[in-house]
């Protein structure tokens, strides 16, 4: 068993408790749990600093450390618990390399803060304070009330996007991606792990049996339906490569042509993941897509059953809910994730187009050579409405580290 253990981070404050429940569950199923930890970092803390250069690299460090410990100790199976942007794909990459019976447990989302706030409310508050729209006292009040407890960022940002992607992929138990970090549902999720991993060991079901090309296609469609993060492209490509699945950036464009956006979730929408969980989570959405013929139903999952079998008894969303639109009247008929190619990105770039931007945009290019140059221009009110901001030399090599 491996967990991301980090006392300094609100996001992972509850991981130790969940890890204890998982270990107890394993120990009561004729197995022996051995707990070890690896690193994690918070993009929310690192954002806007040189520390962000370490973020993407941490994904590989996490994958390497899991592979190293499990490989050296010859463990029969692995249960990984994670809940931040980079440690979830890091876990899946590590599990894929090891290719022994494995399950991923999502640490869970944070509850909404005061006035329906979340982490991005704090970031926007800093911008409002910088532009003299709110006072310092108002900013401090936002900071004190936006994050009421442990859990990952509550919107459909990278963490919840990857949690949903992993559930759709079949590598976590049904319902794991939407549960609150401190909920009874999350505790039950952890208590069910022992029986689940025992079943995988008995049947010798490995990540390579689950993480197939068709499963990745399911994952992409679910991400699109939820209005998920562009970072999913980056991480799914790496995860697929690990298990020998051919997945290209162009596949997101092709699959996206027939994949509707259905979820009104932040940052482009209104609602947060705990509110989606209250009406059923991600499973009813997957059943909607399956009934429209948009998912590959025969894919194997960590339950030992196929996707179709998992979804058989899932109930539909309540009739009057406003979070998930029906497939017949989507928020957007095709994907919000667009793959662009041109002289700025000859090998491709990913854009998130929600439909609110119109069909085209023309503006004056403002080119900067670093994040710091860009921030200086913003803080000094040198960016005007209609400008197109281009930040060069911030990729994986040039940054280095691909700072966000």
Spans of features found by a protein language model:
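Single conserved hydrophobic/aromatic residue that forms the stacking wall/gate
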Residues: 1-11
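Glycine-rich phosphate/diphosphate-binding loops that line cofactor/substrate pockets in enzymes
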Residues: 4, 28, 68-73, 210-214, ...
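Short acidic, glycine/serine/threonine-rich loops at helix termini
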Residues: 12-16, 44-51, 88-96, 106-108, ...
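Anionic-ligand anchoring segments at beta-strand to alpha-helix junctions in alpha/beta enzyme folds, i.e.
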Residues: 14-57, 231-234, 251, 339-340, ...
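Feature captures the catalytic cores and cofactor-binding loops of soluble hydro-lyases/lyases
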Residues: 18-21, 101, 248-404
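Flexible, glycine/charged-enriched surface loops at secondary-structure junctions
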Residues: 29-38, 136-142, 176-180, 201-216, ...
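Short glycine/threonine-rich loop-to-helix capping motif typified by GTGT followed
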Residues: 47-53, 225-228, 242, 277-279, ...
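Active-site cavity-forming subdomains of large catalytic enzyme subunits
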Residues: 52-218, 222-223, 228
